[in-house]
Each structure stands twice: as C-alpha cells, then as structure tokens.
Amino acid sequence: MLNSFDSAYHALCEEILEIGNQRDDRTHTGTFSKFGHQLRFDLSKGFPLLTTKKVSFKLIATELLWFIKGDTNIQYLLKYNNNIWNEWAFEKYVQSNDYHGPDMTNFGHRALQDDEFNELYKEEMSKFKQHILNDDSFAKKYGDLGNVYGKQWRDWVDKEGNHFDQLKTVIEQIKNSPNSRRHIVSAWNPTEIDSMALPPCHTMFQFYVQDGRLSCQLYQRSADIFLGVPFNIASYALLTHLIAKECNLEVGEFVHTFGDAHIYSNHIEAIKTQLSRNSFDPPTLKINSNASIFDINYEDLELIGYNSHPAIKAPIAV
C-alpha cells in the first residue's frame, strides 16, 4: 500500500518508464522524458516527504533557508554539511588558474567509471570543501554560484539597475490583497542565465488564498525525477508552510507542474527498486518559532513521525 503522496510520485515514475521518450541531454547521460505533467498534494493531510526511500529533510530545509536568505554561496550549506551544490562550485574551481591538482576534466562521469580516479576526486573535493569553510576569501571567489535562486528571489535587478525583493513583496501582497492573481515569484531571469552555475530548474511559483488556506503552484521546467523531484516537492511544501504561518493562514495544496520530467538512464534500476516498496504514513511538520520567515533557522523546524525505507544512491548528472 502507498500513502497518497508516495502514490502520486510512483505513478509519475511508472508512466515515464512506460511511455517516456528516449532523449539525449546536456549531460550526455541520456533520459526517458515526458513533457507536461501535474501532481497535487493536500498539505493538510501531512508533509509530503517520500517514504519509499529516505529523503533528508535537513538537506531540503537548509537549502530552502539558503534561498530565503538570498544567499548564493555554498559556505552556508557546508556549515550544515549540505553538499548538494558542491559539484557546480567545484567545477568552477578546477577550471581556474588557481587549481594545481590532478586533472579533474569531466569529473562526474570519470568518478563513476574509474575507482582510482574516484579516490582522487574525493580527496580534491574534500580539500575544496575545507577551503570554502575555513577561508572566506577563497569561499567568496569559488563558493559563489552566481545569480541563482536566492539572488533572484530576494534581489532581482532590472535593466535600470533597480533592486526588487520578490519574496518579501509577495508576502506583503498575500497579507494585504489575498485574492490577487499576481502572487508570483520567478527565478528565471533571461538576462542573467549565463551568470548562473546552473539555470533554475524550478523556475516560477504562484500562491493562491482560499477559505483561509494558502496553496502554492510551482512550474518546474526541468525535473530530475529520481534525485531532484523528491527534494523539490518537500522544499515547496515547506515554503508554503512557512509563508502560510507568516501570513496567519493554514496550508492548502502544493501543485507541482512539470515541463520536461525525466528519468536519467543511469537511475532506472534505482527507480525500480523504489517502486517495489510500500510506503509508511507521511510525517507532519511543526514550526517551533514565531520568528519571521526571514529569521527562521533550521533548528526551529521539526519533522514528526518520519519513517521510511533506506536511501537509494544514484549518480548526479552535472
């Protein structure tokens, strides 16, 4: 048996495996892809953290709080032992004139295929992380990912050079004009795509208030179904909870709309393992602080009753 959250996710995985289009991609890994799909999660029925594999709430929450703070440097994430953005910063470093270690060209694929190289890669990555944590000037130069999510959410710059805080503005709009159809935040800034380590995959979200409940719809242009989407579901569910609390509302639905929803070819066996599992009851979320959303810390968040099957490892496509 599956709970409603795991069931919706499993159905999408099964559909992509059954009818997905086989396509090449930027990473040259290969994918099975479906264009256009929507999932709906009733947040009043629990917190949608998948249970058919263990998903780290800490990684999800600290990344979201990093976005909310407007931060774009992995130093904050590494302080919480959050490594999900490391590869993109590391890639910039090993391509620079300041790097004098072993050749790290195409490190993502080589680490998977060559055990000896993988040990070198892990050693160089470990050194890089310590430099980021302990040397602020190094972190400023090589830990920053460019104008990624947090920058666009909190400090969008228009062509005249004016700065605009989208997240703060949308919260004020929800409070003062709840029926507005303009409760929108966009991370997709076409003029700054080239200055981002990775163009935003989850590109735009909109809020909707009805009967004292706040719902959120995300449009995700590119969705790594196995590794990314379980994080994205929980991240935007958490964002909905935080903004609902900020605006004295209850939570409604999280609606997840996909553009290119894909399973990488080297994730298929991992997906099949997950699909063979039954689920547990979903956990619940408790926010143990009345602080502003902009001052919330990870320690203020409590996930209650999360039981899951073991995690399933799979390579990330860089």
Curated annotation (Swiss-Prot):
The active site is at residue 201. It catalyses: dUMP + (6R)-5,10-methylene-5,6,7,8-tetrahydrofolate = 7,8-dihydrofolate + dTMP. Pathway: Pyrimidine metabolism; dTTP biosynthesis. It is found in: Cytoplasm. The keyword Methyltransferase applies. GO terms for molecular function: thymidylate synthase activity. It holds the Pfam family Thymidylat_synt. The keyword Secreted does not apply. Belongs to the thymidylate synthase family. Bacterial-type ThyA subfamily. This is Thymidylate synthase. It comes from Staphylococcus haemolyticus (strain JCSC1435). The lineage of its organism: Bacteria, Bacillati, Bacillota, Bacilli, Bacillales.
